[in-house]
């Protein structure tokens, strides 16, 4: 209880925490773990948009945000980016089932204070929560090493060559847009988007759409 209590007011009101996750069971489970660490009141939101509205209404002391919400693989990152524009000091802890250092690094770049896997043991979850609650940062050592290795140049490797159209569509895919939304924005057919996506997966060596998002981010970051 020691560190998290620093966020409480002088009248010792419970810590206000907002968990944004589309799986109620996960939010409830994390809530139980956090309650073992400090006196707190926990609210939850099942989507990024509802998380934004809940933040505006409640102005919590700390937020726990799922990296991927629903089918949008980077919805959590977009929410963090939006929050940081208006509240640069809000402690934000990201939890995720993805073990991608690329997505983890992106979450940290956009303002997350910490990131942890959903299946981490309770003791590690409490450690991450405590550190972020006191205003610090938390990334487990293995993931931190993987993030650091992203900056190591790899001799003999070069980025795949993409056409202008392929880059345009890849950019929208990495933003978490659906094929239908991409088709509408680019004024092309859904089938064209689907076909280009297949080409992109082949060129970037992506196994599926989630992997394409990760490799797309790396492509634009120049890794």
UniProtKB/Swiss-Prot annotation:
Keywords: Cytoplasm, DNA-binding, Methanol utilization, Phosphoprotein, Transcription, Transcription regulation, Two-component regulatory system
Residue ranges annotated for the HTH luxR-type domain, each copy included: 155-220
Post-translational modification: Phosphorylated by MoxY.
Subcellular location: Cytoplasm
Listed SMART domains: HTH_LUXR, REC
The keyword Lyase belongs to this UniProt entry's keyword annotation: no
Major subcellular location class: cytoplasm
Transmembrane segments: none
Identification of the protein by name: Methanol utilization control regulatory protein MoxX
